[in-house]
Amino acid sequence: NVMFDVGDKVNKELKAFGANITVTSKNASILKDIYGVSDADTPKEYLNESDLGKIKTIFWTNNIVALSPHLEGKITLDNGYVIPLEGTWFDHEIELPTGDIFSTGETYMKSWWQIDGAWPKDNEQSYALVGTALANKLQIHKGDSLTFKDKDNQEQSLYVAGILSSGGEEDNKVITQLSTAQDILGLQGKIDNITVSAITTPENELARRASKNPKSLSMKEYEVWYCTAYVSSIAYQIEEVVQ
């Protein structure tokens, strides 16, 4: 029930690249990529936060370096501006089904992010990073409070822990703890996508065939592919545990 955006990236540069697997709702991805239908046109589908720990139970668990969940929405500030909101993990400890503790989040995934201020802590609520482009546009500074209305039209606020320079789309967002965003948006336990950083073997013809249709492989080919750390086989195994 999920779909993947996978890339064959050089493993020693994983920290520079960040994620090389992105897990999204299959139907949402197909509608957007094939038919050009936006989220506003169709009922939105979500993944379940409760499935995140299962990713570290696949055959290639030791190759999963880090992962981050993401939930996106919008909030309207008290000055009338509508701005993008994203919830994620920053430095989060997750207890795996095995009983082990796995530390992960954006501090592990986005080593190139520059923060003027401090990273929000996952065990605190209502702290946020504000992207530098958005901060410049709205004259937001670290230490400020952003006041807005939530889904129930109740006034809430986010404390600006730092200003983020990412060099990407995050420079135009407010990014807060996943649990905070879920509460604001009324989407407890839900996420839009998962980004995964995995150590992989370069793709070859077998891996490319398998990524299109694993059922096209012979039994021997399937075993070789499944038991090799191709990005496509790791993604396939994630698909087996994430619904």
What are the residue ranges of the model-derived segments?
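Soluble non-cytosolic domains of exported or imported proteins
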Residues: E45-Y46, L129, T228-A229
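Mobile, glycine-rich extracellular loop/lid and propeptide segments
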Residues: I94
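Mechanotransmission and gating elements of multispan inner-membrane complexes involved in transport
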Residues: K151-E155, I163-Q243
